[in-house]
């Protein structure tokens, strides 16, 4: 190995280190004893033939440490990083085994002290270079963690890799203080601590979860756990908060629910305070007849809701008297209505049968005539208008108006009767019976004025045609005089006004 650094002055500090570490012959163990050598070839120490001032031979390990310190690197940091500084802490090294043991112990102490310092690749490379071997590999230079120089050191030193890793790493982990051991994220202790922390946080959140009890169960629990079996409202609140941490928050919400449960359940009875027990608020206790509402003392499930008979009777009395009287008389009233409807239905069937026997042909003929008249309305529209105007011009205004109004009502009744004959009577009676409890019809009610009658469903033009057709029939009974020009003086406005006047008040255009 060629000379890379200048010769040290005689009064240098590493001389004492070299002299203290030289425990063996220069060929095998003198300079390499401090570095844990003795099992391999000696380091090339013949490049330093000049002895120091006190007679000790300066090994390349000590020289490299000196030169690195003289280059401006901090002494404390290099002593903690460089493994050769371990030889300064051992006063007498007898053999290589003792040197390895002392080196591992001092190395672990120095490395635990240098945990706070930042280690980079150049410092690790300098430590490897100071050992005198060709260990400047990219792997050793690239590693910046604490354990990487220890792992690479076994291949560079004289010991075998297996023995060095077994001795050095076990000594390092064994001699590390507890603080540095817990700082490692991958150590078993940190994993165990995280496993211990997780159940504690889960248990903490589990205690703050909502308990699976109803408000009635909580109130019953509080009352039954009291020796006097009586509690005020504030004492019930306090018992629930002491037992379940969940109810220590959002107090206004669940306390309202507690008050509602006390008021609306018959199993809780309010007892006023006596003079011997002064204080604020009444007592709440369980109803003596409520018994054991929960199965086998388990508050998770209630058997059946308790109802006090006296309170239930009071509730029934507080209901509306009209409603209760209607409910009480509704069965007899319903039977009376049913019998009345059955009687009416029987008579309607008899009347219908007799009507078909006597005048069946006439009704059928009337229906046919009506249908034929509807089919011919479009063709005879002009004639109807002429006849209507003739009727209005020949007679006074109020007479045909009154006469036509009476005839229109008669026509509506006939039409409704014909529709009733065509429909099944049971359907009509069922319809009226179903509508009877809901709506009471006025006294002058006729089926023709129903909103769903045929007159309401017909368009406005068809209704006007029917009216004019009826007027033309009545106009035929007058003197059959020819058409005059008097209807021209009447005008179209009076015609539409007469139609609007004749229209019944209930008709609406769809």
UniProtKB/Swiss-Prot annotation:
The modification Phosphoserine is found at residues 187, 190, 320, 322, 330. Its main location: nucleus. Residues 20-39 have a biased composition (Gly residues). It is found in: Nucleus. Residues 1-62, 175-205, 309-359 are annotated as: Disordered. Residues 341-356 have a biased composition (Basic residues). Gene3D superfamilies: Winged helix-like DNA-binding domain superfamily/Winged helix DNA-binding domain. InterPro entries: FH-like_dFKH (IPR047388), Fork-head_N (IPR013638), Fork_head_dom (IPR001766), FOX_domain-containing (IPR050211), TF_fork_head_CS_1 (IPR018122), TF_fork_head_CS_2 (IPR030456), WH-like_DNA-bd_sf (IPR036388), WH_DNA-bd_sf (IPR036390). It comes from the Eukaryota. Keywords: Developmental protein, DNA-binding, Nucleus, Phosphoprotein, Transcription, Transcription regulation. PROSITE patterns: FORK_HEAD_1, FORK_HEAD_2, FORK_HEAD_3. One of its GO terms (cellular component) is nucleus. One of its GO terms (molecular function) is protein domain specific binding. GO terms for biological process: anatomical structure morphogenesis; autophagic cell death; cell differentiation; determination of adult lifespan; DNA endoreduplication; endoderm formation; insulin receptor signaling pathway; Malpighian tubule morphogenesis. Residues 47-60 have a biased composition (Low complexity). It holds the Pfam family Forkhead_N. Residues 209-300 bind DNA. Fkh promotes terminal as opposed to segmental development. In the absence of fkh, this developmental switch does not occur. The nuclear localization of the fkh protein suggest that fkh regulates the transcription of other, subordinate, genes. This is Protein fork head.
């Amino acid at each position: 190995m060629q000379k890379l650094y200048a010769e040290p002055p005689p009064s240098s500090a590493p001389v004492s280190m070299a002299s203290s570490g030289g425990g063996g012959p220069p060929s095998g163990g003198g300079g390499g004893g401090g570095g844990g050598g003795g099992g391999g070839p000696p380091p090339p120490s013949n490049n330093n033939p000049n002895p120091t001032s006190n007679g000790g031979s300066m090994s390349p390990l000590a020289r490299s440490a000196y030169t690195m310190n003289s280059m401006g690197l901090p002494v404390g940091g290099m002593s903690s990083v460089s493994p050769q500084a371990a030889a300064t802490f051992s006063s007498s090294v007898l053999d290589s085994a003792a040197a390895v043991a002392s080196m591992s112990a001092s190395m672990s102490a120095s490395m635990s002290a240098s945990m706070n310092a930042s280690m980079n690749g150049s410092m690790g490379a300098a430590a490897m270079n100071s050992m005198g071997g060709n260990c400047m590999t990219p792997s050793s230079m690239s590693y910046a963690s604490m354990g990487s120089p220890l792992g690479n050191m076994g291949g560079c030193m004289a010991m075998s890799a297996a023995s060095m890793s077994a001795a050095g790493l076990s000594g390092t982990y064994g001699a590390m203080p507890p603080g540095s051991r817990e700082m490692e994220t991958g150590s078993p202790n940190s994993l165990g601590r995280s496993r211990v922390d997780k159940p504690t946080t889960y248990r903490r959140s589990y205690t703050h979860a909502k308990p699976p009890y109803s408000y009635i169960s909580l109130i019953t629990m509080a009352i039954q756990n009291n020796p006097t079996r009586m509690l005020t409202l504030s004492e019930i609140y306090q018992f629930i908060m002491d037992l379940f941490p969940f109810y220590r928050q959002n107090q206004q919400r669940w306390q309202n629910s507690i008050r509602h449960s006390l008021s609306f359940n018959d199993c809780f009875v309010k007892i006023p305070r006596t003079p011997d027990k002064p204080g604020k608020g009444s007592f709440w206790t369980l109803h003596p007849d409520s018994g054991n509402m929960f199965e086998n003392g388990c508050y998770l499930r209630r058997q059946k809701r308790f109802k006090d008979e006296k309170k239930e009777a009071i509730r029934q009395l507080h209901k509306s008297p009209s409603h209760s009287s209607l409910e009480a008389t509704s069965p007899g009233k319903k039977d009376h209505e049913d019998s009345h409807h059955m009687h009416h239905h029987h008579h309607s069937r008899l009347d219908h049968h007799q009507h078909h026997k006597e005048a069946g042909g006439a009704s059928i003929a009337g229906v046919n005539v009506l249908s034929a008249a509807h089919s011919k309305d479009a063709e005879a529209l002009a004639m109807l208008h002429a006849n209507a105007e003739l009727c209005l011009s020949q007679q006074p205004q109020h007479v045909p108006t009154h006469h036509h109004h009476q005839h229109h009502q008669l026509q509506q009744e006939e039409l409704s009767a014909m529709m009733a004959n065509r429909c099944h009577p049971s359907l009509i009676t069922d319809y009226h019976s179903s509508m009877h409890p809901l709506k009471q019809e006025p006294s002058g009610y006729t089926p023709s004025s129903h909103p769903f009658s045929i007159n309401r469903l017909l368009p406005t033009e068809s209704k006007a045609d029917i009216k004019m057709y009826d007027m033309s029939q009545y106009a035929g009974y007058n003197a059959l005089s020819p058409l005059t020009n008097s209807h021209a003086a009447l005008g179209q406005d009076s015609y539409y006004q007469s139609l609007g006047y004749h229209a019944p008040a209930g008709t609406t255009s769809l």
